[in-house]
């Protein structure tokens, strides 16, 4: 069974096992009577068997998601606005401009062209001043990337820093500062104090009268840590101000929470490390433009009582199976399913293969040979934004999740 169909089977069976009228809408009409019969015959055995089957189905789904166990998100888990916006842009929802929080957000076409998974990491709260630098102008901090699976190949990574406008002093409009990003090559304990061994990863000269996010390429460091299995000693940020006094050093690049700032605001402004990787399954993320679906016109669809093979509506709601606590978006999706007859002779619009035509022809003279079956002939992917078992936010592309076309095969 292909991964997409297996996913749908897991979702449907879980909802059948959970029972209740609220789940009936997800079961095709042709299957409701059969479900009722199964539930009736099961009797007292239903509870124990259902629990065991549900556990097995959930394990299958988690394995497909690349998760070792079911995520149990903590109440303190934060979904970065950047990841929400990236999901909206990637899934074709950019028309809803009022929902895009990052005004200066640009879709990372190049990084996503070789990735089907995007992960985000906040830095550890503890910061270390780097000795030998001017007051509060350089810090060393750490991102824990141990949750990245072994089979995921990282292709690129970026560090996002939020900087605020500073309007102090008469010459602030002419002020510039340079932001340098370094990889720490040796831990501080192994080097002479004041002489931290680093290598420059990226640098930028920016005007300090603008409030915005800045993105830096830290791919060389992350590739060393993940591909080459080199020790991760963290990153260092250095802010060098031009045309400004020392009293303003480090004030407008946000790498730590200010005292008057609430936890909610700081959670969205913290430095964010974003990795782009591929687990070897499926295609890379591709930006989709939302378009109104216009179902292909088929003459038989105009007749309500037509029973020929076609696509039917099937909405999968993650809240019905209790997965909405760790699946951030979408809340559900239209999966569709294929159902209907494959009559002889097969019409062109039934999207049949030569084999299906021959099989249907033989069936017309020999009923022991089954008819061709109504099955999906075209499937598409969906993107999912979720929290993994380590409370890390993941955006991933899953193939073969939506039926786009049906046919007799």
Swiss-Prot record:
Glycans are attached at residues 144, 209, 351, 366. SMART domains: TGFB. Disulfide bonds join 309-374, 338-406, 342-408. The modification Phosphoserine is found at residue 91. GO terms for cellular component: extracellular space. Residues 284-308 are annotated as: Disordered. It is found in: Secreted, Extracellular space, Extracellular matrix. InterPro entries: BMP4_TGF_beta-like, Cystine-knot_cytokine, TGF-b_C, TGF-b_propeptide, TGF-beta-rel, TGFb_CS. Keywords: Chondrogenesis, Cleavage on pair of basic residues, Cytokine, Developmental protein, Differentiation, Disulfide bond, Extracellular matrix, Glycoprotein, Growth factor, Osteogenesis, Phosphoprotein, Secreted, Signal. Pfam families: TGF_beta, TGFb_propeptide. GO terms for molecular function: BMP receptor binding; chemoattractant activity; cytokine activity; growth factor activity. CDD domains: TGF_beta_BMP4_BMP2B. GO terms for biological process: blood vessel endothelial cell proliferation involved in sprouting angiogenesis; BMP signaling pathway; branching involved in ureteric bud morphogenesis; chondrocyte differentiation; deltoid tuberosity development; endochondral ossification; glomerular capillary formation; heart induction. Residues 20-293 form a propeptide. Residues 1-19 form the signal peptide. Homodimer; disulfide-linked. Interacts with GREM2. Part of a complex consisting of TWSG1 and CHRD. Interacts with the serine proteases, HTRA1 and HTRA3; the interaction with either inhibits BMP4-mediated signaling. The HTRA protease activity is required for this inhibition. Interacts with SOSTDC1. Interacts with FBN1 (via N-terminal domain) and FBN2. Interacts with type I receptor BMPR1A. Interacts with type II receptor BMPR2. Interacts with FSTL1; this interaction inhibits the activation of the BMP4/Smad1/5/8 signaling pathway. Interacts with TGFBR3. PANTHER family: BONE MORPHOGENETIC PROTEIN 4, TGF-BETA FAMILY. Belongs to the TGF-beta family. Growth factor of the TGF-beta superfamily that plays essential roles in many developmental processes, including neurogenesis, vascular development, angiogenesis and osteogenesis. Acts in concert with PTHLH/PTHRP to stimulate ductal outgrowth during embryonic mammary development and to inhibit hair follicle induction. Initiates the canonical BMP signaling cascade by associating with type I receptor BMPR1A and type II receptor BMPR2. Once all three components are bound together in a complex at the cell surface, BMPR2 phosphorylates and activates BMPR1A. This is Bone morphogenetic protein 4.
């Amino acid at each position: 069974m292909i991964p997409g169909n297996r996913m749908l089977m897991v979702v449907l069976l879980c909802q059948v096992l959970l029972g209740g009228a609220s789940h009936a809408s997800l079961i095709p009409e042709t299957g409701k009577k059969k479900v009722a019969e199964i539930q009736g015959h099961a009797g007292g055995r239903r509870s124990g068997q259902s629990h065991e089957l549900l556990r097995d189905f959930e394990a299958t789904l988690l394995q497909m998601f690349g998760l070792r166990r079911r995520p149990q998100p903590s109440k303190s888990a934060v979904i970065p606005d950047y990841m929400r916006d990236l999901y909206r842009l990637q899934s074709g929802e950019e028309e809803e401009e009022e929902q895009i929080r990052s005004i200066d957000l640009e879709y990372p076409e190049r990084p996503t062209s070789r990735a089907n998974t995007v992960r985000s990491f906040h830095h550890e709260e503890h910061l270390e001043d780097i000795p030998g630098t001017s007051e509060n102008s350089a810090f060393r901090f750490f991102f824990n990337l141990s949750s990245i699976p072994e089979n995921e190949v990282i292709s690129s990574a970026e560090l996002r820093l939020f900087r605020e406008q500073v309007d102090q002093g008469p010459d602030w409009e002419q002020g510039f500062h340079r932001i340098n990003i370094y990889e720490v090559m040796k831990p501080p304990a192994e080097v002479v104090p004041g002489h931290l061994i680093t290598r420059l990863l990226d640098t930028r000269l920016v005007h300090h009268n603008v409030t915005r996010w800045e993105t830096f390429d830290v791919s060389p460091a992350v590739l060393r840590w993940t591909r080459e299995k080199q020790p991760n000693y963290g990153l260092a940020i250095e802010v060098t101000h031009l045309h400004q006094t020392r009293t303003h050093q480090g004030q407008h690049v946000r790498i730590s929470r200010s005292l008057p700032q609430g936890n909610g605001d700081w959670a969205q402004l913290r430095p964010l490390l974003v990795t782009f990787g591929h687990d070897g399954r499926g295609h890379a993320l591709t930006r989709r433009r939302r378009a109104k679906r216009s179902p292909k016109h088929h003459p038989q669809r105009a007749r309500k009582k037509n029973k020929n093979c076609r696509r039917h509506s099937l909405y999968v709601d993650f809240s019905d199976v209790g997965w909405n606590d760790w699946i951030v978006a979408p809340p559900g999706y239209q999966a569709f399913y294929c159902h209907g007859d494959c009559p002889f002779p097969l019409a062109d619009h039934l999207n049949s293969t030569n084999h299906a035509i021959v099989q249907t022809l033989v069936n017309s003279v020999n009923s022991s040979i089954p008819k061709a079956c109504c099955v999906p002939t075209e499937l598409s992917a969906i993107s999912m934004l979720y929290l993994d078992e380590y409370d890390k936010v993941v955006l991933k592309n899953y193939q073969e999740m939506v039926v786009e076309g049906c046919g007799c095969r």
